[in-house]
Amino acid sequence: MPGQSVGAVQPQRAHFDQPLHLRSGGVLPAYDLVYETYGTLNAAKSNAILVCHALSGHHHVAGHYADQPDNIGWWDNIVGPGRPLDTDKFFIVGLNNLGGCHGSTGPSSLNPATGKPWGADFPIVAVNDWVHAQARLADLLGIDSWAAVMGGSLGGMQALRWSITFPERVRNAIVIAAAPKLSAQNIAFNDVARQAILTDPDFHGGHYYEHNTRPVRGLRLARMLGHITYLSDDQMGEKFGRELRNSAFSFGYGVEFEVESYLRYQGDKFAGYFDANTYLLMTKALDYFDPSREDDGNLTATMARTQANFLIASFTTDWRFTPARSKEIVAALLANGRNVSYAEIDLNFGHDSFLMEDAHYHGVVDAYLRNIKL
């Protein structure tokens, strides 16, 4: 279902003066959120869908910028007229979360108390903090309840958190390629990535902005590690195998295999535009996410607070958040008599499958959204 792109779009900025008290104990006295919208909010304001981004995502979900036609939104293939998130029917909202590096208040923003970039002094943010900030944006837009809150990976965790924190404001939650909490292995991956950044000599305790430098080497390594976990072994084998860039071994430590070249390219590209402090914050938000902790680890008790209908989707080759993790959420919801649709989709792209255009996958989302009553 190719549909159409939403075309040229423009980001918007919302400023909030009301202090936001964070789970970490920190306080943001004021903050900005950058966001984009697609489609038209109906008179009843009942057709709004919030799209939450994953670790490296942002507000630019769909379309392109007039002066940057190649800057396509990260989920453009699913948003637009005739696509699952049909902008002829729905009003789509995407934003850059607090702590981000794409315009919303984050570590690279000026700390009003010092007049310098926040850097490492920016308070740790949790998924629930994002949800509260997003709720204030909904208030600003006049949206009392979302037709749906959705996202993949860390975005799916935000959708899950919305359904628990503001059950009366979410009619449907679409949780894709997510988990109710991170496994020890996932926490370990995140810690290694953070150590790559923290031990970079150019990190300067998180205040590298003042030194006119960036911990590029550490961020590059962190992204290379993360990227491996986003792909499936089968996909990497099919795409790269053991192919060499040249016809013979060089017997050195330079790039020889095509997979090495790919990972270094991805690391360099990411380190060129992303902020290391934001990467640290996002990975900690992932580590801390565990709504069931409020109920002594009982996810069924936690999900009893929800009221929404749910679509839970997982991918067969996602070894970072396996289908078994999604089924934990499904089981907890069914134990509470919730209306749950579950899809286990056979795609070969590993964790990144949620970003891909696939007829079956998009058909599942489209069929679910078609049944939403506005």
UniProtKB/Swiss-Prot annotation:
EC identifiers of the protein: 2.3.1.46
Localization terms from the record: Cytoplasm
Enzyme class, spelled out: transferase
InterPro entries, per database record: AB_hydrolase_1, AB_hydrolase_fold, HAT_MetX-like
Coarse class of the protein's main subcellular location: cytoplasm
Site feature location: Important for acyl-CoA specificity: R320
Pathway(s) where this gene product acts: Amino-acid biosynthesis; L-methionine biosynthesis via de novo pathway; O-succinyl-L-homoserine from L-homoserine: step 1/1
Entry annotated with the keyword Transmembrane helix: no
Binding site for substrate: R223, D352
GO molecular function, one term: homoserine O-succinyltransferase activity
Catalytic residues, chain numbering: S153, D318, H351
GO biological process: homoserine metabolic process; methionine biosynthetic process
A Pfam family recorded for this sequence: Abhydrolase_1
Quaternary structure and interacting proteins, as annotated: Homodimer.
Record function comment: Transfers a succinyl group from succinyl-CoA to L-homoserine, forming succinyl-L-homoserine.
Protein family: Belongs to the AB hydrolase superfamily. MetX family.
HAMAP family: MetX_acyltransf
Protein name as it appears in the record: Homoserine O-succinyltransferase
Top-level taxonomy: Bacteria, Pseudomonadati, Pseudomonadota, Betaproteobacteria, Rhodocyclales
